[in-house]
Amino acid sequence: ESDNNYVPGVWAIGDVLKGEGYNQEFLIGSDKKFAGRSSYFHGHGNYDIFDYYTAIDRGYIDDDYMVWWGYEDEKLFEYAKNELNNLASKDEPFNLTMLTVDTHFTDGYVCELCQNQYDEQYSNVIACSSRQVSEFLDWIKQQDFYDNTTVVISGDHLTMDSDYIERQNATDFNRRTYFTIVNGAAVNEKPCVEREYTTLDLYPTTLAALGVQIEGNRLGLGTNLYSGEDTLIEKYGLDYINVELLKDSQLYRKKLLYGKN
């Protein structure tokens, strides 16, 4: 793994914000090298990365401390408060991105904050995580930097615990990955319309929420959801887009994936 070998030909949110002078940090409770995360965040925005080993180096946890993927989300949120205050004190634009993992497959991690509300461990962990996110957001709203700060909350994927979903009798439920924006700077041109969108659309939408003006309201294959423009799946349908994305692309394989002209 090098510092910039993860799809070096793409231009990501971190690249855009770096160009605008943002201080950027990625905060996780596990090893930064897992799944190429270090390569991506160093190569696309020069993020400072605070991971499991950073917490050890700073004396926050003992050398032999290891739960779940490294340290639990309860600690992650507390560390994030310190990091946010440090970033805000510089009086420069900042982007703190953090990844929670207590709700990961299988069954999640039961921390000291979890309550025994439900019969299933996973249900208790999900409820506990929701409370922690809510309390963290409430804390952010009380800080001086909040008025000029946008918060994006996004799931990376649905749960992989299909057995749990079946036990909850939720197999017929149209499950969606959670995504919301709090205190965004953009105005929604379709406030009462249910949108059909994919992860591709979150790129321009997130930047628009930060106040970025996007010519044509499109970046890459994504559409700014604040705009009145149709997304690709609204225009062509999901099945058609899936077929097109499976086709071979020389642009992707050479330019985006490997950074070659």
Where are these regions (language model features)?
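Solvent-exposed soluble domains appended to multi-pass membrane proteins
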Residues: 1-261
